[in-house]
Amino acid sequence: MRFATAAPVATDSFAPLSVPVDAGLNAVRGDIAAVLSMRHGGPRPVRLRYECVGRADAPVVVLAGGISAHRHVAANAEFPEKGWAEGLVAAGRALDPASLRILAFDFIGADGALDLPIDTADQADALALLLDHLGIARLQCFVGYSYGALVGQQFAIRHRQRVQKLIAVSGAHRPHPYAAAWRALQRRAVALGQLQCAESHGLSLARQFAMLSYRTPEEFGERFDAAPEVVNGRVRVAAEDYLDAAGAQYVARTPVDAYLRLSESIDLHRIDPAAIQVPTVVVAVEGDRLVPLADCVGLVEGLGPRGSLRVLRSPYG
């Protein structure tokens, strides 16, 4: 089955709000204002927030994660707080700042400022704008996890001359119906909270549902195999403290509109694998219920000789 892919768009306007990357800096953050032509909303003002780590003259790799990821991937001298990809970005690791320039960015809509449908194609075009601002003509590689893998697919299609290789981890060419239904129920939980004037509770519950999809029954069996307790006249099972904490942490850092619109964006994603013309490594996790191995195999088959598959085993579904 083939899916239509949006045609590339012309570069939109932008106005720098931060200093250019300095060759003497190990890490730099920036924030620019741009006008982006969006598939479902026309021209819209957006903010493009990024962080670069590594030598300014090194080959550039973009690293993008799931909808909860952001521009800060790993602690460094300039920005010592913990990042979301500490295991990947470090000396001697797969992405070593000593030999690569690693660029990460906040997805448009992640700040909650866009309350309209956001396509993965919009994210790819926003990245192209960012590369223009930074004076980066071409990426050595785009490494994408989950939602980032979907954005990477769109970037490889819409801006194919600007990337040499794509690595797509846990991201297929279309959402699986089971995963789409799961996300739809999560969004309904948020909507129910909004009706009760308690949208943070709805968002917390949606995140708690998500944790069940990120973890396997085997892990829960090992970690939470304790008898339930009766607390204030209610039965409370062993995993509830963990789920409550995960929900609270997510609510503290995530605007509700950001969650809703980026969740929808996953379900909007559709591409024709044959349209990806760069060498692509697809990484699947065995037992992943949201991005099944069969879907990743379908993506690789559609890529033809340009695609290869790696399968990982993990306790995290």
Task: Identify what each model region corresponds to.
Residues 51-110:
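N-terminal cap/lid subdomain of alpha/beta-hydrolase-fold enzymes
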Residues 121-140:
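Conserved acidic catalytic loop of the alpha/beta-hydrolase fold
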Residues 138-177:
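Conserved hydrolase catalytic core segment
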Residues 23, 30, 187-278:
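Alpha/beta-hydrolase
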Residues 289-295:
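Conserved alpha/beta-hydrolase "acid-adjacent" motif
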Residues 276, 282-284, 288:
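Short beta-strand/loop motif that positions the catalytic acidic residue
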